[in-house]
Amino acid sequence: MAPAPVPALGTLGCYRFLFNPRQHLGPSFPARRYGAPRRLCFLPQNTGTPLRVLPSVFWSPPSRKKPVLSARNSRMFGHLSPVRIPHLRGKFNLRLPSLDEQVIPARLPKMEVRAEEPKEATEVKDQVETQEQEDNKRGPCSNGEAASTSRPLETQGNPTSPRYNPRPLEGNVQLKSLTENNQTDKAQVHAVSFYSKGHGVASSHSPAGGFPRGRTPPARQHG
């Protein structure tokens, strides 16, 4: 092989600083007491926009379209993965109650209903009781009056029975009172007219002659 070319002496003077940086004659700070001299560090120039100047941006009106989540955007909101439900190893028999067992019959409260007597029946009953008390106070009645009072009561029946009609009883009571008043008036008129004519009445209270006390029989004229 051919030997490597040897550089010229002039060129070696340029590259000797690469191998021995201490011999570099560039600007440097004064050497420290312990260590090599410090080099200046040149900062790269900022090629961006100057301060307080906004970059030019093309502004467009907001669109009315709804944003559509893509595969890339979905990762930003969270990783969506299907939920896996583990399989049940054992079998469970669920027994649901039937409809017949769930239905509970409703129990209605028992309410005692008392049949109220009509007002007319109670009024008539009170009238009958007062009439009986008045009859007892007056004393024993004649046979005709007793029969007349007993017949309508027997025919009408019990006033508290459901088939009892209170209206006929009121009419019978009124008719009874009217007939009694008429009988007493007729008896008084008959007695007054009989005594006014001068006829005698034979009674248990009159004397033997058949004339009332305090009166003399009229003299008979002999022809």
From Swiss-Prot:
Organism placement in taxonomy: Eukaryota, Metazoa, Chordata, Craniata, Vertebrata
Name of the protein this chain belongs to: Putative UPF0607 protein LOC392364
UniProt superkingdom: Eukaryota
Bilayer-crossing regions: none
Region named Disordered: 110-223
Composition-biased stretches (Basic and acidic residues): 110-138
Composition bias, Polar residues: 145-163, 174-186
Source organism of this protein record: Homo sapiens (Human)
Family designation: Belongs to the UPF0607 family.
